[in-house]
């Protein structure tokens, strides 16, 4: 199923999924030391030391599935999503139409041909070809472009943009060369309000917008749009029209039969069911998100998360005030950015006033088109609305690298919005319960939120200002020092091994590794200060500090085959679980005292080699 996606390719999303059933039993915040095997030295491998009992229980068994907190919560959440989907009338209609696809093949193909023909009917000029491109975008033909929402920085309202396809060899299906990955739309230059030039008449963009049918005053553009239009204007009209027709046929015929699906995907998929599963996020994701929020509200958990977020923001602010390597100017800019950071938790409180589609369950391609028309209507209803008011709904329709649905088990920070969001699944059982031990809460959810906050100040986040605008707020000297600290973190993580003899990819994971270290420091600082304010000291304080480290270490317990471990490491922006733990604790001074770490231990770092960035 497409819903069980524990890792995301972009937006620097923190994939922490907590399974309370696996946490060490806790009484008065003292970790159960029975799980710690004496033959495992914490200074050599703290991850294994803290997770020894769980790992020992899996010895001798090759996992049938990836195991551990991250994967346990993903599976639990996928089960919830499946229950929601099975009850959805839209999903039932799609299943019914899919089952009847062979019987309705002739009618389905005829419908597709009619749509392609009507889209291009009478088009002979360049201007009419541009309008046809807009109509194809409205229709939802991803090989041409897809329609998305985004926040306009000028007034914090929602606009729309069309996102070009990923580069594929030399050309996209539309015939226009795509020179960069789609996240350039948001990550490299900000999207700006489009202003029509009434003096020079209609432009290429104006004709495309006419075909899309949305008010041009809400359109947002960037350099990629300019490049797209410049290349488009060099292509012959007949070639544009042919490519549009081919793209429409290739997309829609895949819903008509297994043979068409294989033919038009060049064997990448083998059946309509497989094709539907690949496109289900785009077509049905909004409706799953809506029904999921109705079935699994997070009202009871939100007060605890709101309080926790405020505490972690305060903790990081104090750390910024005490920062020793930033100049006063950059330090103040960082504090201002933190003070402006948005905090969002749980189930969306307001949904756009758009009608849900009434699918017939007859022709699959007709139902898919109805879903896409409904998606278009929902985007239209969001335009001009406050981004804050409809956060995080617009993320379902805004995505450089795939939509973020509110049923996903995840949390993320968005640099272009300067806000973080803990999605509902993290606030539901088994990820969170109101009975969760306080130490466990800070070591897990505190670290999670601290991690997301730190993303505002990592290599990418640091290039955006307090308003989410791409703007340099660093002095030259501070930027150089920051680069130096990141290089040290890269070297540190690269010294760890994914598997024996296989070094970690520190440069690939540095953004998440910096956030892991910052998140731990923020949460641990707050926890220790909270204990001291309560008058806890001596051995009791030491035991509660130890418990924090042990709870933290259980967050990333995982059991994967060696092949899966290597395959994941090759593309994942997060380090392997044992590296995320060992690569953090070795930089924390208290860890050395709490667990009697000495210079002879493998994880030992001299005080001057311990890294503190945030």
Residue ranges, per PLM feature:
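Bacterial N-terminal signal peptides that target proteins for export
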Residues: 2-12
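Bacterial N-terminal signal peptides
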Residues: 11-22
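Active-site-surrounding "flap" and adjacent substrate/cofactor-binding loops of secreted or lumenal enzymes
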Residues: 41-44, 49-112
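His/Glu-rich zincin catalytic helix
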Residues: 32-34, 39-72, 176, 181, ...
């Amino acid at each position: 199923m497409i819903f069980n996606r524990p890792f995301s390719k972009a937006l620097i999303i923190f994939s922490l999924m907590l399974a309370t059933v696996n946490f060490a039993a806790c009484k008065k915040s003292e970790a159960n030391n029975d799980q710690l095997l004496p033959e495992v030295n914490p200074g050599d491998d703290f991850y294994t030391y803290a997770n020894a009992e769980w790992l020992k229980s899996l010895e001798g068994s090759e996992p049938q599935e990836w195991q551990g907190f991250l994967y346990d919560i993903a599976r639990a959440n996928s089960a919830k999503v499946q229950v929601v989907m099975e009850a959805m009338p839209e999903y039932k209609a799609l299943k019914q139409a899919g089952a009847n696809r062979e019987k309705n093949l002739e009618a389905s193909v005829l419908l597709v041909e009619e749509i392609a023909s009507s889209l291009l009917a009478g088009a002979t000029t360049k201007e009419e070809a541009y309008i046809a491109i807009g109509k194809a975008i409205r229709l939802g033909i991803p090989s041409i472009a897809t329609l998305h929402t985004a926040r306009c920085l000028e007034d914090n309202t929602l606009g729309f943009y069309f996102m070009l396809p990923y580069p594929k060899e030399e050309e996209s299906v539309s015939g226009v060369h795509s020179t960069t990955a789609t996240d350039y739309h948001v990550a490299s230059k900000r999207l700006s309000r489009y202003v029509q030039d009434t003096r020079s008449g209609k432009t290429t963009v104006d004709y495309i917008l006419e075909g899309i049918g949305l008010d041009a005053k809400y359109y947002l553009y960037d350099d990629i749009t300019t490049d797209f239009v410049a290349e488009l204007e060099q292509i012959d009209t007949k070639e544009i029209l042919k490519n549009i027709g081919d793209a429409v046929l290739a997309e829609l015929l895949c819903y008509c039969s297994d043979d068409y699906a294989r033919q038009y995907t060049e064997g990448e998929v083998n059946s309509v069911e497989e094709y539907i599963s690949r496109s289900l996020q785009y077509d049905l994701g909004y409706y799953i998100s809506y029904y999921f929020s109705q079935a699994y509200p997070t009202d009871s958990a939100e007060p605890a998360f709101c309080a926790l977020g405020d505490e972690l923001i305060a903790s990081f602010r104090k750390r910024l005030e005490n920062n020793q390597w930033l100049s006063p100017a950059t330090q103040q800019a960082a504090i201002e950015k933190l003070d402006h950071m948005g905090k969002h938790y749980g189930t969306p409180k307001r949904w756009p006033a758009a009608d849900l589609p009434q699918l017939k369950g007859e022709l699959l391609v007709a139902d898919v088109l109805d879903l896409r028309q409904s998606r278009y209507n929902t985007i239209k209803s969001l335009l001009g609305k406050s981004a804050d008011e409809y956060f995080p709904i617009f993320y379902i329709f805004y995505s450089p690298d795939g939509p973020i649905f509110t049923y996903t088990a995840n949390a993320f920070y968005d640099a272009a919005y300067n806000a973080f969001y803990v999605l509902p699944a993290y606030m539901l059982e088994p990820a969170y319960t109101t009975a969760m031990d306080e130490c466990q809460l800070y070591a897990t959810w505190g670290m999670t939120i601290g991690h997301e906050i730190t993303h505002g100040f990592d290599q990418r986040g640091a290039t955006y200002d307090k308003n989410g605008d791409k703007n340099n707020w660093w002095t030259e000297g501070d930027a150089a020092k920051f680069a130096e600290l990141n290089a040290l973190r890269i070297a540190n993580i690269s010294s760890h091994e994914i598997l024996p003899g296989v070094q970690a990819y520190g440069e690939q994971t540095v953004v998440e590794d910096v956030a892991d270290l910052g998140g731990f420091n923020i949460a641990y600082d707050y926890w220790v200060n909270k204990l001291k304010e309560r008058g806890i000291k001596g051995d009791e304080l030491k035991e509660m500090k130890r418990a924090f480290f042990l709870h933290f270490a259980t967050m990333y317990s995982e059991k994967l085959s060696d092949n899966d471990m290597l395959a994941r490491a090759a593309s994942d922006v997060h380090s392997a679980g044992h590296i995320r733990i060992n690569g953090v604790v070795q930089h924390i001074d208290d860890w050395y005292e709490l667990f009697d770490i000495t210079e002879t231990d493998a994880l030992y770092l001299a005080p001057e080699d311990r890294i503190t960035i945030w």
